[in-house]
């Protein structure tokens, strides 16, 4: 790692329980400042969620690493991301798997994320402007689904787009939110509460 700030961040993540070396390497390789406004760049390697406009945020690096680690990704895992946002989480995923599918309900965020990913020579991502509650059915089923905004309850449509043996990680709740891991075992879904979190809400529909 040639970026001392990234190196310090990765050390912080490891000390705080992130064990997957490939996830840590991906975090180190993605320049978080590229996904922030000029005014926020000085905080790029702090472990904080930061505003990206449109009432949305870029998640804190610990949460990005934790959610990614929980998915137990393999190189050939087919991944769906709900909520492209800045594209930072998308970029981390793209370094770990062959292809990422990502849905964003706010058109301007989708286009900004596409531009940033292209600038970083990340081309193994397909993005779509649409309603995240609906997933991306014609590209599924998926081995892993990651939701980057909090739903009041688990969207049943997303469960149906999960492969047998697949994993989904998402925040659930309104005022008090929990990070939930769900694993599909044939027609059953086994869920586990991971920890308390704080995300922006997952809103149905899409915006121009």
From Swiss-Prot:
GO terms for molecular function: protein-L-isoaspartate (D-aspartate) O-methyltransferase activity. Gene3D superfamilies: Vaccinia Virus protein VP39 (3.40.50.150). Keywords: Cytoplasm, Methyltransferase, S-adenosyl-L-methionine, Transferase. It catalyses: [protein]-L-isoaspartate + S-adenosyl-L-methionine = [protein]-L-isoaspartate alpha-methyl ester + S-adenosyl-L-homocysteine. It holds the Pfam family PCMT. Disulfide bonds: none annotated. GO terms for cellular component: cytoplasm. Coiled coil: none annotated. Its EC number is 2.1.1.77. InterPro entries: PCMT (IPR000682), SAM-dependent_MTases_sf (IPR029063). It is found in: Cytoplasm. Belongs to the methyltransferase superfamily. L-isoaspartyl/D-aspartyl protein methyltransferase family. NCBIfam families: pimt (TIGR00080), PRK00312.1 (NF001453). This is Protein-L-isoaspartate O-methyltransferase.
